[in-house]
Amino acid sequence: MEDMFSPLIEVENLRREINRHNQLYYVQDNPEISDAQYDTLIRRLKELEEAHPELVTPDSPTQRVGAEPLKAFGIVNHPYPLLSLANAFSDTELEAWYQRVKKLLGNIPFQIDCEPKMDGLAVALTYRNGKFATGATRGDGFQGENITRNLRTIHSIPLNAEPNAPPVFEVRGEVYLSKNGFAKLNRERADKGLPLFANPRNAAAGSLRQLDPSVTAERPLDIFIYALGYSEDSLLPDSHWQILDYFSKIGFRINPLNRLVNTLEEAKEYYRQMAANRASLPYEADGVVFKVDSVSLQHRLGDVGREPRWAIAYKFPAEQVMTRLKKIGISVGRTGTLNPFAVLEPVNVGGVVVKQAALHNEDDILRKDIREGDTVIIQRAGEVIPEVVAPVLSKRNPESKPFRMEESLFNPNLNRTACPVCGGEIYRPAGEAMHYCANVSCPAQFERQLEHFVSRGAMDIRGIGESLSVILAQQGLVKNVSDLYYLTTADLLQLPRMGEKSADNIIDAIADSKTRPLDRVIFGLGVRHVGNETATLLSRHYGNIWALAKTGLGELQTIPDIGDKIASSIVAYFSEEKNVAVIRRLEEAGVRLTSDQKPVNKNMPFSGMEFVVTGKLESFSREEAQEKIRSLGGTAKDNVTKATNYLVVGADAGSKLTKARSMGVKELSEREFINMLEQS
């Protein structure tokens, strides 16, 4: 009998000891034994479990890794939604949030929890009877992907809760890669000849979504718990701060930089300190989260859309770095615009290597006094688009000269300003900021037109991107957009590095694009000043391309949102015989030039309603959401105005949400928007 029980006793003792050392090492950062001693304990436990497989349990430390790869992730329904946070970008916006909370609470005093806003991936961890049962991604806030097996590989996530933990509870946390862990991971990938991750967040997200948990286990992922989702223990304190302290004591990792403050000024000071020390943090953070501490007051404040009223994320300013502006280059757009851009010494900005940045136009360059050879400050606007903020005047060469578009475009061979691609005449219309190439046959214009025509927002022809558009134009295979529909596999096989399968796929994609809606065709034609919103208006008003082609200036000006400039541009486009000839060839090739949408009438569900969509939606893309709005008679706009009736709010909404709130625009969560669609 003693022989029977001794392995069980040793296994239980080993698990208890290993879990204790995991807690000391991964959570408390206070190890008692060396890595070699820890490995010895793990090795002995594995030996015993291999000899006695009946003793293996899901919560054993050996079971963090080793399961078979999944074919797909399952779905987990969140018992309580994982809401996203409203953003503040200034002290003024933070103060506005604070005053709204005070007003809603009737001036009841409240404390504020201050927490670094980790730039990772939100997850929900559910424990049942002391065991880690389920782990899921945020998903759309209501449903997430079941990534339990991958989360088990993260050593700072306890597989067992302490005996005094609630019988069933869910905690929420942010999985992330430290800066050092990210650098180490990319070094290893470089050594193996694998593509590098752009930034720690992408690396963490990609690691958690591996179907094979052994791959996740190789990534140095970590977690901070930031909230209690729900609990069956009704005796937990009425304080977010005290709840996190409780979970810290029973084995969960809580950010040691969290603070509890009593006033708005203390909250602002916390933000200033975190922003000042951002670069020295061991992980990426993009702001600070402020929360009303009292749980009962949180419930009283409730939610609006998909955001809690009792919390806000105060984002850090865009990361700025210095580099040298080597040259101001000029590119040619599809409508002939001459677009200046900065050629930079490559520099890492927020995890992305930036080599070029937009400069908009000559007036903007002169306003900022940006010159070639300057040391300049670069940031990624909205953490996405690289832009030149300003020159560093103390580092400027005293012999540098202000930028002049006409000087930059002067062609000594022609003894005049000229398009840098075709040598065509240059002009700048009165009242406009842009210079234009006057040559409608400019090859650079057509390359951009072709790229625009095949783009996702227009005809969405998969397989033809920027580089292939240029090759097709330069090889003379496509002289106007209608030529695409007369290409053959044999034509494409003439191109360098083009295989038969790739050529067949492109021909199939071109054929598939023939059934795109009329508004996509109109947008794809690239009529000056006609964006996708205007293209949709024209499609629904006229119903077919030939009715639009024959319309006059006066009729166009009667259509809402079609101003004089747009109307004149449309008439000018269709008065060009070469443009009409292209449309005829599109029709002959079988491209659909009529609309199957019902004409807008006052009885359609969304008739008279104007929507703006912001943030990232889970159920469909922004373009798909806009199409659904238009199909029900509504108007989908890109910007919030006084005419906006509804703002559809997805994850990570930014300035549009702030503007909408200041104007009293009604907000819709994604789920509320879907309900409106279903009821219509």
Curated annotation (Swiss-Prot):
Binding annotation for NAD(+): 35-39, 84-85, 115, 138, 174, 291, 315
Q: Which UniProt keywords apply?
A: DNA damage, DNA repair, DNA replication, Ligase, Magnesium, Manganese, Metal-binding, NAD, Zinc
Give me any GO biological process, just one: DNA repair
**Which reactions are catalysed by this chain?**
NAD(+) + (deoxyribonucleotide)n-3'-hydroxyl + 5'-phospho-(deoxyribonucleotide)m = (deoxyribonucleotide)n+m + AMP + beta-nicotinamide D-nucleotide
One GO CC annotation, please? Answer: cytosol
Sites where the protein binds Zn(2+): 419, 422, 437, 442
PROSITE patterns found in the cross-reference section: BRCT (PS50172), DNA_LIGASE_N1 (PS01055), DNA_LIGASE_N2 (PS01056)
Locate the active site.
Answer: 117
What is the protein's known function? DNA ligase that catalyzes the formation of phosphodiester linkages between 5'-phosphoryl and 3'-hydroxyl groups in double-stranded DNA using NAD as a coenzyme and as the energy source for the reaction. It is essential for DNA replication and repair of damaged DNA.
The protein's name = DNA ligase
Q: What is the lineage of its organism?
A: Bacteria, Bacillati, Chloroflexota, Dehalococcoidia, Dehalococcoidales
